[in-house]
Each structure stands twice: as structure tokens, then as C-alpha cells.
Regions:
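Asp-based, Mg2+/Mn2+-dependent phosphohydrolase catalytic module
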Residues: 16, 21-118
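Residue-level "hotspot" positions that anchor or transmit function at local structural transition points
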Residues: 10-11, 42
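Short, acidic loop-to-helix structural element flanking the phosphoryl-transfer center
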Residues: 1-10, 16-20
Length: 118
């Protein structure tokens, strides 16, 4: 995805200290142009603030962004921010109808392709 020229931002409810530690441990921090946590916002997910701020920091309006989520609260936050949404719920929740509000639902991150981002 990054090789296609997309900017990647991380909008999370997790504390930044934890996020930074995980990204460093996995050596994947360099993939993210922006990292932003709801801990710096007045409200966490499902409020859209963390997504709106991440889009702003990336230099985009939310309508130009695509959110990839795994949780229902995150999906609600991204939809409320007016982003296109791709959801990849845990297998146990894959058939839960509440995820049908997503624009695209996948079973695995491995299924995500550049075609989903058009």
C-alpha cells in the first residue's frame, strides 16, 4: 500500500507509549507518517475526533481517507468522521450484522489489496 504512494496514519485508542513500544518492537514504525492517540482528545472512540485529527495531520480531509478497523467502536468513529471504511473483525464477530455498516468487510488483513483502496 505504501509503495502505491498512500500516506498511512495510525488512529488509536491505545496510549502512545504502548503504541510506540509495539511499533518499535515489530520494527514497523517507519510505515506510519502520523500516529495519533485518542488519549490526546477529549473523547475516545467511537467519537470521531482521533480520526479527524489524524487526517488533518496527514494533510487530508476525512472524506479523502480510508480507515481500516477491527472493532465496532473504531468503525463507528471512522464512519462518523465520514471516512470510507474497511473492517476486519475478529473471526468470532465476522458474521455480526453490526459490521455491515462498513463499506468493505474482509476476513483477514492479508486480503487487503490496492483494489480496495480505489
Amino acid at each position: 500500500i505504501k509503495t502505491k504512494g498512500f500516506k498511512i496514519g495510525l488512529a488509536t485508542s491505545s496510549p502512545m507509549a504502548l503504541v510506540d513500544a509495539v511499533l518499535a518492537r515489530l520494527n514497523i514504525g517507519h510505515y506510519f507518517a502520523v500516529r495519533h492517540s485518542a488519549e490526546f482528545e477529549e473523547y475516545g472512540k467511537p467519537h470521531p475526533a482521533v480520526y479527524i485529527q489524524t487526517a488533518t495531520q496527514l494533510g487530508f480531509v476525512p472524506q479523502e481517507c480510508i480507515a481500516v478497523e477491527d472493532s465496532f467502536n473504531g468503525l463507528l468513529a471512522a464512519k462518523s468522521a465520514t471516512m470510507k471504511t474497511i473492517v476486519i473483525p475478529e473471526a468470532i464477530n465476522a458474521n455480526n450484522s453490526r459490521f455491515s455498516i462498513a463499506d468493505i468487510q474482509l476476513s483477514s488483513l492479508a486480503e487487503l489489496s490496492a483494489d480496495h483502496l480505489n
